[in-house]
UniProtKB/Swiss-Prot annotation:
Entry keywords, A to Z: Sensory transduction
PANTHER family, sorted: ARRESTIN, PHOSRESTIN-2
Protein name per Swiss-Prot or TrEMBL: Arrestin homolog
GO MF, any single term: G protein-coupled receptor binding
Disulfide bonds: none
Organism field: Heliothis virescens (Tobacco budworm moth)
Domain of life per record: Eukaryota
GO cellular component: cytoplasm
One GO process term, biological-process aspect: signal transduction
């Protein structure tokens, strides 16, 4: 029987340290986060008498690079996990994964496994879409694994003996969605009798990226006012927790209609409005929140941020939410009636291992293990 498995591979510039990782997406299950594990292949002559450390680094950029003048910078690095890889500990407090076991068997004595434990409150990988004329790194939260040679874990690493590989911290759609969203709002008028009533219902609470959101709307006009126009939109809420006034909203899909209008007093209207929030229609908008992106990978609108406790938010995080909003226009004097429903927009949990590709940060190496003849071959992509 033949087993094939692919891993990401990246070497230090001096060729003495090589990092192998089976994946670059680590799932946040809200209460816990998948550990980051891999294998480091070391040149035994080079590391003799030295120490090798592994770290998970979170970078948070909250301003444009071109605005950094006179020593001012808008960039923070957070070291969320750290471990001494070499010399290895006498006793390991975790079990090796199957990929780690296979890599150690294939690579030989110089291969050392490692595992970094991620705190559950760490922010998700989210970036803010830059403007068309902006240069430099986008604002947002990104992660990478860093392997380096140094005297201590706080020692400044040298570029030639350092490996840094970008990763992502992601969340997937929950297995059990919540109740169907529904709301009813009413508007009274000071000098007129009766009410205008707007009822909104979504067909479900959880939507997958690319799905169409069906907004079921029912208007009951018990007043003597006239509804002249209806406008619906999907809003993306972005909360940059670091700033007190860091909350704003982006319209990522919208529709305006006069079907059934003008809606006269004593009339009612039932209508279903279809809206599809996608990045394809928002590529020219600065500040749209996107899922963290690896090289050569496509991205989408940022997924909804799920929090165990909404009051316990990381100060360096970006919290994303979505809502469907419908507005009835009654004219300049009578004003408007607005209803809003929050919903969840996420990626489904992957049912199978997805295809992985090489990029400018990491090669992809395939190991082929023949368990009958105990022979192995390696192919590099």
């Amino acid at each position: 029987m033949v087993y094939n498995f692919k891993v990401f591979k990246k070497c230090a510039p001096n060729g003495k340290i090589t990092l192998y990782m089976a994946k670059r997406d680590f799932v946040d299950h809200i209460s816990t986060v998948e550990p980051i594990d891999g294998v480091v292949l070391l040149d035994e002559e080079y590391v003799r008498g030295r120490k090798v450390f592994g770290q998970m680094v979170c970078t948070f950029r909250y301003g444009r690079e071109e605005d950094e003048v006179m020593g001012l910078n808008f960039y923070k690095e957070l070291f969320l996990a750290s471990e001494q890889i070499y010399p290895p500990p006498e006793k390991r407090n975790y079990e090796l994964s199957r990929t780690q076991e296979r890599l150690i068997k294939k690579l030989g004595d110089g291969a050392i496994p490692f595992r970094l434990t991620v705190p559950p409150g760490a922010p998700g990988s989210v970036i803010l879409q830059p403007g068309l004329e902006d240069d430099g790194e986008p604002c947002g939260v990104q992660y990478y694994v860093k392997i380096f040679v140094g005297d201590s874990e706080i020692d400044r690493s040298h570029r030639r003996s350092t490996v840094a590989l970008g990763i992502r911290k992601v969340q997937y759609a929950p297995a059990k969605p919540g109740p169907q969203p529904c709301t009813v709002v009413r508007k009274d008028f000071v000098l007129s009798p009766g009410q205008l009533e707007l009822e909104l219902t979504l067909d479900k609470q959880l939507y997958i990226h690319g799905e169409t959101v069906a907004v079921n709307m029912c208007v009951r006009n018990h007043s003597n006012k006239v509804v002249k126009k209806i406008k619906a939109c999907i809003q993306q809420g972005v909360d940059v927790v670091l700033f007190q006034n860091g909350q704003y909203r982006n319209i990522v899909a919208s529709i305006e209609t006069q079907d059934g209008c003008p809606l006269q007093p004593g009339s009612s209207l039932q209508k279903v409005l279809h809206l599809t929030p996608t990045l394809a229609h928002n590529r020219d908008k600065r500040g749209i929140a996107l899922d963290g992106q690896l090289k050569r990978s496509d991205t989408t609108l940022a997924s909804t941020t799920l929090l165990l406790d909404p009051d316990q938010r990381d100060a360096f995080g970006i919290v994303v939410s979505y809502s469907a909003k419908v507005k009835l226009y009654l004219g300049a004097i009578s004003g408007e009636l607005v209803a809003e429903l929050p919903f969840i927009l996420m990626h489904p949990k992957e049912g199978r291992v997805k295809m992985i590709h090489a990029d400018s940060q990491a090669d992809v190496e395939m190991f082929r293990q023949d368990t009958v003849h105990h022979q192995e071959s390696v192919e590099v992509y």
